[in-house]
Regions:
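Short, acidic, metal-binding catalytic loop of nucleotide-sugar glycosyltransferases
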Residues: 22-34
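Conserved donor NDP-sugar-binding/catalytic core segment of glycosyltransferases
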Residues: 104-134
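Short, flexible, basic/aromatic active-site loop/helix in glycosyltransferases
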Residues: 134-152
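Acidic donor-binding loop at a coil-to-helix junction in glycosyltransferase catalytic cores
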Residues: 178-189
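Catalytic beta-strand/loop signature of glycosyltransferases that borders the donor
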Residues: 198-210
Length: 228
């Protein structure tokens, strides 16, 4: 079984990137899985390539590096989709570049997508934060579904889906949402509207490092607007 995790590098904060890589290095990979990771980097970030390679040198994971000539998350996500269309992966995933994943994340994702005969699995994102006000904001805006609940959309901070979905070459992220965000929610909502089954996996957890910009109320308001 071939699986690829896609990570779009959008920040230059090495502290968060190192934490992400360290968690990937600790990830439990079932014996029947061949795992690859694809990093999508803007041209001006490509110097990170050697740094990432060094961090993974003791782990037997095939690394892929994709470059984009212009910034913008939807462009990076579409670059990854194009790459996956040319490969024979069974499942592909998106994770954020500032998130740490639980050691059992991959096992839990594979287990549920098979047992529920799902097309797409979404999961929760926890947050490293001590401020009680910030914690309350996250409780308001973050999805809180039951385990195995059928849902209508997922986010690219924690998702795994069947690569066969990409046989439809029209499926892509909307670049018109580059400046406002929300292209991932719209992408997976569209797939749900086409009949694809999306299930919530409460046991496959990722944890986000909190950026200073996200401690401000205006950031929460904008994010809540995107979530609807």
């Amino acid at each position: 079984m071939k699986i690829c995790i896609g990570i779009c590098l959008s920040k230059k904060n090495k502290r968060f990137i190192i934490r992400s890589i360290n968690s990937l290095n600790q990830l439990f990979v079932p014996d029947d899985c061949k795992l690859e990771i694809a990093y999508v980097l803007p041209n001006n970030f490509f110097y990170f390539k050697d740094f990432i390679i060094r961090k993974f040198e003791e782990k037997k994971i095939n690394l892929n590096f994709l470059s984009i000539s212009r910034g913008g998350i939807p462009y990076a996500r579409n670059k990854y989709l194009s790459f996956c269309r040319s490969k024979k992966y069974h499942y592909i995933s998106f994770l954020d570049d500032d998130c740490e994943i639980d050691r059992s994340w991959l096992f839990e994702m594979i287990k549920l997508i098979k047992s529920e005969n799902a097309d797409i699995i979404g999961g929760p994102q926890n947050h490293k934060v001590n401020d009680s006000n910030i914690k309350n904001y996250f409780k308001i805006i973050e999805p809180n579904y039951k385990h195995k609940q059928t849902i209508k959309w997922a986010a690219t901070n924690n998702v795994l889906f069947k690569n066969i979905i990409l046989n439809d070459k029209k499926i892509k992220f909307d670049i018109n949402l580059d400046k406002v965000g929300g292209s991932d929610q719209l992408f997976f909502y569209y797939l749900w509207s086409k009949g694809y089954k999306i299930i919530w996996n409460k046991k496959a957890i990722v944890t986000e490092g909190l950026h200073e910009s996200r401690k401000k109320i205006d950031w929460f308001l904008k994010r809540n607007f995107r979530y609807g």
